[in-house]
Regions:
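Flexible "arm" and connector segments at domain edges
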Residues: 1-65, 71-270
Length: 270
């Protein structure tokens, strides 16, 4: 076995081998028992924690969390190596070929089409519907709605003006209000309202994920200010007292540093 104890510094190949040792018979029972689905949530959590490092521009967090993401990639690849379906080298080969294919001018190919046309050709997508259907269903719903609308616009569905998108949001909200008041199932109307809000974001060229994250941060700050202003625990306050405390806090204070850079970019990586 490789001596992992005495090294002062480790490299990529050490990590690859360490994952193999942990998952091998006689290694760590927990690591050896994991499947793609059992650690799926771990993959997502590590990716979001890496994003937290980006948002804070903290190199220590980024270094640690990118390592955790890399560990997840190697772990899943090693599961497939054991299953005999593909290896880490296959993963590297696939992504290299993808990058070379998507940059024909740089790597000596003939004139290429646009970015979306290149991706459609690469993925074997023949229709605009194929392109929309290729958007991952596992994405957060707000993000998925944004991507669907952008791809539909790229296929020829003309983007709406700000006024038109706001009108559709008003219409969707009115349907939601009616469904709620009449005691029906508001699920569809609520979904349409959220989808319409994403259309407004597109018309404004704003990233809905960023906007909602910033709204969450403002909510936390306002709640903290309300709690600090209370003279007793919030649980001991009456509904009227809580309402007064909430309404006296300025929702725009303190001025929060945005969690995310503006991310409205038609040149996507997937």
């Amino acid at each position: 076995m490789v001596d992992f104890i005495s090294k002062d510094r480790y490299d990529f190949q050490d990590l690859v081998r360490l994952v193999q040792v942990l998952r091998a018979p006689g290694g760590c029972p927990w690591d050896g028992a994991q499947t793609h689905l059992s650690i799926r949530r771990n993959f997502l959590e590590e990716a979001y924690e890496a994003c937290e490092g980006f948002d804070r521009d903290d190199p220590e967090i980024m270094c640690e969390e990118l390592g955790d993401v890399l560990l997840q990639v190697l772990f899943h690849a090693d599961i497939e190596r054991d299953a005999g379906r593909f290896t880490l080298d296959d993963v590297c080969d696939t992504v290299c070929k993808k990058l070379i294919f998507r940059h024909p001018r740089l790597f000596g190919s003939a004139e290429s089409g646009g970015w979306e046309e290149m991706k459609q050709l690469e993925k074997g997508q023949k229709t605009a519907s194929d392109t929309l259907d290729s958007v991952a269903r596992s994405l957060p719903a707000l993000w998925r709605a944004e991507k669907l609308q952008k791809k539909a616009a790229g296929a020829g569905l003309a983007p709406e003006s700000i006024a038109a998108s706001l009108d559709k949001l008003d219409l969707a909200a009115a349907r939601l209000r009616k469904a709620a008041q009449e005691g029906g199932n508001p699920d569809n109307a609520l979904g349409e309202t959220l989808f319409a809000a994403v259309r407004v974001a597109a018309a404004l060229q704003e990233d809905p994920e960023t906007s909602l994250h910033q709204a969450c941060e403002r909510f936390i700050a306002r709640f903290a200010a309300m709690e600090a202003a209370a003279e007793k625990p919030l649980r001991a306050c009456s509904p009227d007292e809580l309402r007064t405390l909430w309404n006296t806090q300025n929702p725009n204070e303190p001025h929060l540093r945005p969690l995310h850079e503006k991310r409205y970019n038609d040149h996507e990586q997937d």
